């Protein structure tokens, strides 16, 4: 077991010292009660039954009942407080892991699967709870009882105790042999389980596509393949565990049988009393059960320890911190400038997306961006939001290099509406005020009216307080986009970024909404990426992007005359 990992876990347990003291006292009480019962048995046999002293029998039974009561009460406190500590500790770990994850760089999520994240924050952390309970409760209890029972066995009979001690190294051999193999299998089992979680997440996020293409049978077969892979690791691990358990039981009970055989001979010879052998066998059984329990726990520790290791990697991967950010100059009219910017995604290192791009946009302007798929249009927005950092060149906001500014401060200036509207489970209203939870009811109602939400919300039973389901499953694509736009406008941004934000609306609705947006954003900047020319036809000027660079710019009329690429895009849409 990795001591460093356990030390890290101990850091989360330190703030629950009082609870842990109660757990330790309870553990010692449980162990002491069980061990004392052995000496009571010896007195019962030697002084009570053998000499026919009924009072000794009564006293022994009374002591046993008293010890059982202490055992029961102590067991209650042990179980309650250790599980309570485990729940509080894992909640703190879960919160810390979640807080770290949510502050990762965006590009790091390209390498992570959502299912793997979910699995780590749920299944892995549940395994850590098991680790806390098993180690602080059962492992320590069994260790105390093992040491105590062996010590008492030596007091009863040195010879018989030595026989029992010999069995421990015999049990250590298979534990060491199988341990490394089980650790590898545990890691693979957790990784395989994460793949299952990813598959489930992906399947039900795309359930409509699966139905539309009749892919249910294919998805079931694919899921079954992943399930069988997971099962193989689990079965192999369980076989090793079962084999070790069988070996442990055999060795322990053979040792007890040998003790009984030799002990019976010593009773006949008068070297031991009947009470001593009964007491010794009782301690031997406790030692055997405790030893078996310890080895069983050690063989099972690999899974939760691996889970802890996976969570610690999340917690230790702290976001890049900068303490020397410049103060954002927000007194001048808003402006944006790209100077010779290059960019390549880490996940696609051989494909340059932005190539020596330069552009400038000042306040009170509406900039449209067009280009073919993969030209780099959306990447412009991603860079402006500081989701990624450019390789070369400079991006300026208000003539300040954005790499020297706090990303959170930059994003306060911006409202972003992606093509696939980000809708959270909850109500229409809760999704809108996500953009500005300090907005007044009058401001919310005004935005709802402008974006056309009022019209469809009025048909719902609870209006804007209607539940819309996970990811807005009860809404149409156009309704989701209206909510996303309302959220952005409620933020009162200086820069509004629209990435195919009205693609689900008809042309008439789009134009009406666009006019409202332009009025609200007067004096600020609108950047709109569009495949549909009607979305940016009224822009002050339009950039045509191809192969990561600006190949033409101007008004719609200018580009219709002077840009072959722009004319082709317009012609293709007219053909459609």
Swiss-Prot record:
SUPFAM superfamilies: ABC transporter transmembrane region (SSF90123), P-loop containing nucleoside triphosphate hydrolases (SSF52540)
Sequence positions that bind ATP: 371-378
Any GO molecular function: ATP binding
Membrane topology qualifier: Multi-pass membrane protein
Subcellular location field: Cell inner membrane
Alphabetical keyword list: ATP-binding, Cell inner membrane, Cell membrane, Membrane, Nucleotide-binding, Translocase, Transmembrane, Transmembrane helix, Transport
Domain ABC transporter: 336-572
Protein origin, superkingdom: Bacteria
Domain (ABC transmembrane type-1) ranges: 20-303
Membrane-traversing stretches: 21-41, 57-77, 135-155, 158-178, 242-262, 277-297
A GO cellular component annotation in the UniProt record: plasma membrane
E.C. number(s) listed in UniProt: 7.-.-.-
Family (UniProt): Belongs to the ABC transporter superfamily.
Quaternary structure and interacting proteins, as annotated: Homodimer.
Domain notes: The ATP-binding domain (NBD) and the transmembrane domain (TMD) are fused.
Function: Part of an ABC transporter complex. Transmembrane domains (TMD) form a pore in the inner membrane and the ATP-binding domain (NBD) is responsible for energy generation.
PANTHER family in the cross-refs: ATP-BINDING CASSETTE SUB-FAMILY B MEMBER 10, MITOCHONDRIAL, ATP-DEPENDENT PERMEASE MDL1, MITOCHONDRIAL
Record-given protein name: Putative export ATP-binding/permease protein RC1073
């Amino acid at each position: 077991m990795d001591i460093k990992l356990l030390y890290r876990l101990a850091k989360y347990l330190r703030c629950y010292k009082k609870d842990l003291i109660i757990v330790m006292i309870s553990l010692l009480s449980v162990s002491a009660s069980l061990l004392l019962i052995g000496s009571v048995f010896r007195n019962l046999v030697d002084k009570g039954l053998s000499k026919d002293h009924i009072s000794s029998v009564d006293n022994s039974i009374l002591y046993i009942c008293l010890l059982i009561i202490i055992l029961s009460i102590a067991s209650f406190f042990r179980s309650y407080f250790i599980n309570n500590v485990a729940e509080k500790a894992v909640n703190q770990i879960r919160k810390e892991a979640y807080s770290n994850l949510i502050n990762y760089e965006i590009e790091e999520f390209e390498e992570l699967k959502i299912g793997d994240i979910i699995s780590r924050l749920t299944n892995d952390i549940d395994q850590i709870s098991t680790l806390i309970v098993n180690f602080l409760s059962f492992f320590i209890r069994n260790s105390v009882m093992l040491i105590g029972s062996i010590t008492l066995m030596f007091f009863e009979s040195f010879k018989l105790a030595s026989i029992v001690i010999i069995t421990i190294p015999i049990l250590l051999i298979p534990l060491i042999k199988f341990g490394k193999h089980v650790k590898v299998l545990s890691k693979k089992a957790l990784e395989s389980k994460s793949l299952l979680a990813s598959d489930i997440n992906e399947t039900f996020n795309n359930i409509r596509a699966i139905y539309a293409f009749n892919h249910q049978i294919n998805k079931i077969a694919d899921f079954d393949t992943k399930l069988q892979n997971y099962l193989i690791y689990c079965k192999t691990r369980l076989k090793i565990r079962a084999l070790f358990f069988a070996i442990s039981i055999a060795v322990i009970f053979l040792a007890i049988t040998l003790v009984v055989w030799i002990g019976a001979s010593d009773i006949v010879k008068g070297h031991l009393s009947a009470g001593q052998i009964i007491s010794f066998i009782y301690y031997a059984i406790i030692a055997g059960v405790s030893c078996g329990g310890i080895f069983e726990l050690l063989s099972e520790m690999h899974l939760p320890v691996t889970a802890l290791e996976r969570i610690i990697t999340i917690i230790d991967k702290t976001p890049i911190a900068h303490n020397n950010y410049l103060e954002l100059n927000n007194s001048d009219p808003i402006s944006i400038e790209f100077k010779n910017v290059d960019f390549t995604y880490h996940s696609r290192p051989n494909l340059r997306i932005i190539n020596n791009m330069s552009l400038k946009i000042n306040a009170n302007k509406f900039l449209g961006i067009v280009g073919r798929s993969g030209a780099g249009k959306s990447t412009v927005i991603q860079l402006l939001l500081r989701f990624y950092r450019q390789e070369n060149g400079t991006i300026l906001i208000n003539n300040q290099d954005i790499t020297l500014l706090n990303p959170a401060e930059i994003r306060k200036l911006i409202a972003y509406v992606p093509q696939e509207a980000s809708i959270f489970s909850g109500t229409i209203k809760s999704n809108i005020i996500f953009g500005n939870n300090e907005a007044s009811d009058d401001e919310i109602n005004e935005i709802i009216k402008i974006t056309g939400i009022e019209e469809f919300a009025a048909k719902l039973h609870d209006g804007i307080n209607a539940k819309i389901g996970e990811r807005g499953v009860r809404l149409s694509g156009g309704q989701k986009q209206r909510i996303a736009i309302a959220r952005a406008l409620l933020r009162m941004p200086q820069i509004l970024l629209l990435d195919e934000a009205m693609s689900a609306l008809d042309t008439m609705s789009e134009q009406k909404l666009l006019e409202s947006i332009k009025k609200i954003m007067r004096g600020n900047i609108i950047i709109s990426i569009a495949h549909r020319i009607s979305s940016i036809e009224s822009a002050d000027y339009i950039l045509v992007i191809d192969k990561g660079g600006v190949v033409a710019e101007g008004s719609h009329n200018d580009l219709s005359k002077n840009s072959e690429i722009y004319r082709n895009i317009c012609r293709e849409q007219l053909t459609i």
